Protein backbone atom coordinates (compact mmCIF):
# COMPACT_ATOMS: atom_id res chain seq x y z
CA UNK A 1 0.00 0.00 0.00
CA UNK A 2 2.77 2.45 0.93
CA UNK A 3 4.42 2.08 -2.47
CA UNK A 4 1.16 2.98 -4.22
CA UNK A 5 0.40 5.88 -1.88
CA UNK A 6 0.92 9.52 -2.67
CA UNK A 7 1.34 11.99 0.17
CA UNK A 8 0.73 15.73 0.00
CA UNK A 9 1.93 17.77 2.97
CA UNK A 10 0.90 21.41 3.33
CA UNK A 11 2.78 23.54 5.86
CA UNK A 12 2.18 27.24 6.39
CA UNK A 13 5.41 27.98 8.25
CA UNK A 14 8.35 28.36 5.85
CA UNK A 15 10.99 26.95 8.20
CA UNK A 16 8.87 23.93 9.16
CA UNK A 17 7.99 23.45 5.49
CA UNK A 18 11.64 23.44 4.47
CA UNK A 19 12.47 20.92 7.20
CA UNK A 20 9.53 18.78 6.07
CA UNK A 21 10.71 18.95 2.45
CA UNK A 22 14.28 18.11 3.49
CA UNK A 23 13.14 15.08 5.48
CA UNK A 24 10.45 13.69 3.19
CA UNK A 25 10.76 15.31 -0.24
CA UNK A 26 13.21 12.64 -1.43
CA UNK A 27 10.67 9.99 -0.38
CA UNK A 28 8.15 11.35 -2.86
CA UNK A 29 6.13 13.53 -0.50
CA UNK A 30 4.67 16.53 -2.33
CA UNK A 31 5.53 19.27 0.19
CA UNK A 32 3.73 22.56 -0.37
CA UNK A 33 4.78 25.54 1.67
CA UNK A 34 1.85 27.89 2.12
CA UNK A 35 -1.66 27.95 3.48
CA UNK A 36 -4.20 25.18 2.93
CA UNK A 37 -6.61 27.90 1.86
CA UNK A 38 -4.34 28.80 -1.09
CA UNK A 39 -3.46 25.23 -2.13
CA UNK A 40 -4.74 23.92 -5.45
CA UNK A 41 -6.11 20.46 -4.67
CA UNK A 42 -8.24 18.19 -6.84
CA UNK A 43 -11.65 17.58 -5.31
CA UNK A 44 -12.68 14.09 -4.26
CA UNK A 45 -9.20 12.57 -4.55
CA UNK A 46 -7.74 12.16 -1.05
CA UNK A 47 -8.29 9.03 1.05
CA UNK A 48 -7.06 10.48 4.34
CA UNK A 49 -6.63 14.04 5.55
CA UNK A 50 -4.92 14.85 8.85
CA UNK A 51 -4.94 18.41 10.14
CA UNK A 52 -4.45 20.58 13.16
CA UNK A 53 -6.80 23.27 11.93
CA UNK A 54 -6.06 26.86 12.93
CA UNK A 55 -8.19 28.30 15.72
CA UNK A 56 -9.61 31.77 15.41
CA UNK A 57 -12.58 34.02 14.90
CA UNK A 58 -11.51 35.17 11.46
CA UNK A 59 -12.44 33.86 8.05
CA UNK A 60 -10.86 33.02 4.72
CA UNK A 61 -11.27 35.07 1.56
CA UNK A 62 -13.20 32.47 -0.44
CA UNK A 63 -15.27 33.60 -3.42
CA UNK A 64 -16.35 30.11 -4.51
CA UNK A 65 -19.82 30.43 -2.96
CA UNK A 66 -19.65 27.22 -0.94
CA UNK A 67 -21.72 26.61 2.21
CA UNK A 68 -18.63 27.27 4.33
CA UNK A 69 -17.17 30.22 2.34
CA UNK A 70 -17.93 32.71 5.11
CA UNK A 71 -17.23 30.38 8.03
CA UNK A 72 -14.57 30.87 10.69
CA UNK A 73 -11.11 29.60 9.76
CA UNK A 74 -11.48 26.30 11.64
CA UNK A 75 -14.89 25.56 10.12
CA UNK A 76 -13.60 26.57 6.67
CA UNK A 77 -10.76 24.03 6.95
CA UNK A 78 -13.24 21.25 7.79
CA UNK A 79 -15.48 22.17 4.85
CA UNK A 80 -12.60 22.35 2.40
CA UNK A 81 -11.15 19.04 3.65
CA UNK A 82 -14.47 17.34 2.88
CA UNK A 83 -14.40 18.79 -0.64
CA UNK A 84 -11.04 17.21 -1.46
CA UNK A 85 -11.80 13.93 0.35
CA UNK A 86 -13.03 11.03 -1.79
CA UNK A 87 -16.21 9.15 -0.78
CA UNK A 88 -15.29 6.63 1.91
CA UNK A 89 -12.26 8.71 2.92
CA UNK A 90 -11.47 9.87 6.43
CA UNK A 91 -10.62 13.30 7.77
CA UNK A 92 -9.05 13.47 11.22
CA UNK A 93 -8.47 16.87 12.74
CA UNK A 94 -7.78 18.70 15.94
CA UNK A 95 -9.99 21.74 16.34
CA UNK A 96 -11.29 23.98 19.08
CA UNK A 97 -14.35 22.74 20.95
CA UNK A 98 -16.39 25.42 19.17
CA UNK A 99 -16.82 23.14 16.14
CA UNK A 100 -18.82 20.59 18.15
CA UNK A 101 -20.17 22.90 20.88
CA UNK A 102 -21.17 25.97 18.85
CA UNK A 103 -24.81 26.89 19.49
CA UNK A 104 -25.37 27.50 15.75
CA UNK A 105 -25.37 23.98 14.29
CA UNK A 106 -25.19 25.26 10.69
CA UNK A 107 -21.66 24.05 9.98
CA UNK A 108 -22.24 20.72 11.71
CA UNK A 109 -25.40 20.27 9.63
CA UNK A 110 -23.44 20.99 6.44
CA UNK A 111 -20.76 18.48 7.44
CA UNK A 112 -23.42 15.89 8.39
CA UNK A 113 -24.97 16.27 4.93
CA UNK A 114 -21.76 14.77 3.48
CA UNK A 115 -20.04 12.84 6.26
CA UNK A 116 -20.62 10.76 9.37
CA UNK A 117 -18.89 11.25 12.69
CA UNK A 118 -16.71 8.18 13.31
CA UNK A 119 -15.47 9.29 16.72
CA UNK A 120 -14.44 12.34 18.71
CA UNK A 121 -12.39 12.93 21.84
CA UNK A 122 -12.44 15.99 24.08
CA UNK A 123 -8.78 16.54 24.94
CA UNK A 124 -7.67 17.50 28.45
CA UNK A 125 -7.53 21.20 29.30
CA UNK A 126 -4.05 22.56 28.69
CA UNK A 127 -3.05 19.82 26.22
CA UNK A 128 -1.21 22.32 24.00
CA UNK A 129 -0.07 24.81 26.65
CA UNK A 130 3.50 23.58 26.97
CA UNK A 131 4.22 22.79 23.30
CA UNK A 132 2.25 25.56 21.60
CA UNK A 133 1.65 28.18 24.31
CA UNK A 134 -2.10 28.00 23.86
CA UNK A 135 -4.72 27.11 26.43
CA UNK A 136 -7.50 26.52 23.91
CA UNK A 137 -9.76 23.56 24.71
CA UNK A 138 -9.60 21.14 21.76
CA UNK A 139 -11.27 18.09 20.27
CA UNK A 140 -9.91 15.32 18.07
CA UNK A 141 -12.60 14.60 15.46
CA UNK A 142 -12.75 11.83 12.84
CA UNK A 143 -15.25 12.02 9.98
CA UNK A 144 -15.98 9.64 7.11
CA UNK A 145 -17.29 11.06 3.83
CA UNK A 146 -20.28 9.14 2.50
CA UNK A 147 -20.66 7.96 -1.08
CA UNK A 148 -23.45 9.63 -3.09
CA UNK A 149 -26.77 8.03 -2.11
CA UNK A 150 -25.31 6.33 0.97
CA UNK A 151 -27.59 6.62 4.00
CA UNK A 152 -26.38 8.87 6.79
CA UNK A 153 -25.58 7.44 10.21
CA UNK A 154 -27.56 8.84 13.17
CA UNK A 155 -26.26 12.33 13.83
CA UNK A 156 -26.74 13.00 17.54
CA UNK A 157 -23.58 15.14 17.28
CA UNK A 158 -25.64 17.91 15.63
CA UNK A 159 -27.31 18.78 18.93
CA UNK A 160 -26.22 20.18 22.26
CA UNK A 161 -27.24 19.29 25.79
CA UNK A 162 -26.95 21.21 29.04
CA UNK A 163 -25.22 19.35 31.84
CA UNK A 164 -24.62 20.55 35.40
CA UNK A 165 -21.21 22.04 36.07
CA UNK A 166 -19.84 20.17 39.04
CA UNK A 167 -18.78 22.32 41.96
CA UNK A 168 -20.17 25.53 40.46
CA UNK A 169 -23.15 27.12 42.11
CA UNK A 170 -24.41 30.63 42.17
CA UNK A 171 -26.30 30.87 45.41
CA UNK A 172 -28.85 28.06 45.32
CA UNK A 173 -28.85 27.82 41.53
CA UNK A 174 -26.84 25.19 39.74
CA UNK A 175 -24.90 26.33 36.67
CA UNK A 176 -24.95 24.38 33.43
CA UNK A 177 -22.43 23.72 30.71
CA UNK A 178 -23.49 23.47 27.07
CA UNK A 179 -21.81 20.45 25.46
CA UNK A 180 -22.27 18.40 22.32
CA UNK A 181 -24.78 15.60 22.83
CA UNK A 182 -22.28 13.08 21.44
CA UNK A 183 -20.04 13.65 24.48
CA UNK A 184 -23.00 13.31 26.84
CA UNK A 185 -23.72 9.90 25.27
CA UNK A 186 -20.01 8.96 25.22
CA UNK A 187 -18.52 10.37 28.45
CA UNK A 188 -15.56 8.00 28.13
CA UNK A 189 -14.43 10.18 25.20
CA UNK A 190 -14.10 13.24 27.43
CA UNK A 191 -10.47 13.02 28.47
CA UNK A 192 -10.40 16.29 30.33
Predicted regions span which residues?
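Extracellular loop and loop/strand-boundary signature of outer-membrane beta-barrel proteins
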Residues: 65-67
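Conserved Class I SAM-dependent methyltransferase catalytic core
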Residues: 10-19, 69-129, 136-143
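A generic fold-level signal
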Residues: 2, 43, 72, 133-136
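Conserved S-adenosyl-L-methionine
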Residues: 1-51, 56-58, 96-98, 141
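A general structural signal for stabilizing positions within well-ordered secondary structure
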Residues: 1, 38-41, 83, 111, ...
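Conserved ATPase-coupling elements of RecA-like P-loop NTPase cores
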Residues: 58-63, 103-104
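Flexible, glycine-/basic-rich loop-and-beta segments that form/coincide
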Residues: 129-192
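Short, structurally constrained coil/turn elements
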Residues: 3, 25, 113-114, 134
Amino acid sequence: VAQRSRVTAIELDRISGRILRSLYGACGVDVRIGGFEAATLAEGTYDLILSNVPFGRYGVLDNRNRPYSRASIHNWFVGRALDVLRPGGLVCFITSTYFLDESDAGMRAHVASEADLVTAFRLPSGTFERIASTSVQADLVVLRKRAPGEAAAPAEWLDLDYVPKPMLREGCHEQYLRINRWFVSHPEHVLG
